Amino acid sequence: MLTITSYFGFLLAVLTITSALFIGLNKIRLI
C-alpha cells in the first residue's frame, strides 16, 4: 500500500514538472 502511494505521488510530481516545462517552453516560443 505504501509503495503504491509513493509511486502515485512520484508520478504526479513528474507530470506536474513536465507540464510546467511544456508551458514554459510555449511561453518562450510565443515571446
Swiss-Prot record:
* UniProt KW keywords: Chloroplast, Electron transport, Membrane, Photosynthesis, Plastid, Thylakoid, Transmembrane, Transmembrane helix, Transport
Q: How does it sit in the membrane?
A: Single-pass membrane protein
How is this protein annotated for GO cellular component? chloroplast thylakoid membrane; cytochrome b6f complex
The record lists the membrane-crossing segments as 4-24
From the UniProt record, give one GO term of the biological process aspect. Answer: photosynthesis
Signal sequence region: none
Q: What is its main location?
A: plastid
User: Can you say where in the cell this protein is located?
Assistant: Plastid, Chloroplast thylakoid membrane
Which GO terms fall under molecular function for this chain's record? electron transporter, transferring electrons within cytochrome b6/f complex of photosystem II activity
The job of this chain, per UniProt, is described as: Component of the cytochrome b6-f complex, which mediates electron transfer between photosystem II (PSII) and photosystem I (PSI), cyclic electron flow around PSI, and state transitions. PetL is important for photoautotrophic growth as well as for electron transfer efficiency and stability of the cytochrome b6-f complex.
Similarity comment text for this entry: Belongs to the PetL family.
PANTHER family cross-referenced by the UniProt entry:
CYTOCHROME B6-F COMPLEX SUBUNIT 6
The protein's assembly and partners = The 4 large subunits of the cytochrome b6-f complex are cytochrome b6, subunit IV (17 kDa polypeptide, PetD), cytochrome f and the Rieske protein, while the 4 small subunits are PetG, PetL, PetM and PetN. The complex functions as a dimer.
- Protein name per its UniProtKB record: Cytochrome b6-f complex subunit 6
Q: Name its species.
A: Cucumis sativus
